[in-house]
Amino acid sequence: MATLGFIGTGGMGSGMAANLIKAGNKLVITDLRREQSKGLESQGAVFKDSPKAVAESCDVVCSMLPYNQAVQAVGLGKGGLHEATSGAKLWIDFSSIDKKTIVGVDAELSKKGWTILDGSAGGVEEAAAAGTLSLWLSGSKAVFDQHQDIFKAMGNKIIFVGELGNAKLVKNAMAMFAAVVHLTLAETCAWLKKGGLSEDTFRTILKNSQQDSVAIDRIMEIIVSKKYKPRKSWMPKDVGFGLDMAREMEVPMPFVALAYQMFSIAQAT
């Protein structure tokens, strides 16, 4: 039985961490908001007061954090992993951030003997709880191969995508793709309804076409049922990372940029 650490027990992280416990691992956890960790503690997880304390109490550290600054703080800040004097020296980070940040943190932590395996998770909170996430990992292929049991506890589609930071690129790319698809479906359904075809009929058509996918049907289910579940949207952040990199690479992305603006407007209102 391994002892794993998990940092970040929000909507996605709590589900991922719970599945590590279900797989038979001991778990030590931390989060800035202790109340988010109560559910995991009731399942046997042990709460620690800092990333440093987590690292010193486990074999491998995992994390799911919301922002670049959070990842930098966990790795290099006060009470961060870089201060750990024993325990884990492998950090598997699933945070939705940009490539530049994880590569920069790795450059500093490697001086302390740490290895980072960069990950990203595709799916919503329900998939995290069910252990059916798509997981993309990058960094050392040997380290990836050695820790399949961790990944299989949290996801059912696991793909290695190359050099460190590529998993973040994949996450940003998937966010950009999803943003454009969301808007296209919404506009198309409004147009069809005005023309006399119901959203439900269009959903059936999509499910029996080459455009069918789990993601598209999930969006269509919401449109048809009109059951819009309010949840924090990370779309502008994740799409924004992709657009920032596009500007640096001088790659024009007008449709993605428009989708970014529409999601930003929705979030602001």
PLM region spans:
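NAD(P)+-binding Rossmann beta1-loop-alpha1 motif at the extreme N-terminus of oxidoreductases
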Residues: 1-64, 89, 94-95, 125
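Rossmann-fold dinucleotide-binding core
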Residues: 4, 96-176
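Amphipathic alpha-helical hairpins
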Residues: 11, 15, 53, 60-62, ...
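Hydrophobic beta-strand scaffold residues
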Residues: 27, 47, 116-117, 158, ...
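Rossmann-fold NAD(P) dinucleotide-binding segment
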Residues: 51-116
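Helical "substrate-binding/catalytic lid" subdomain
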Residues: 166-269
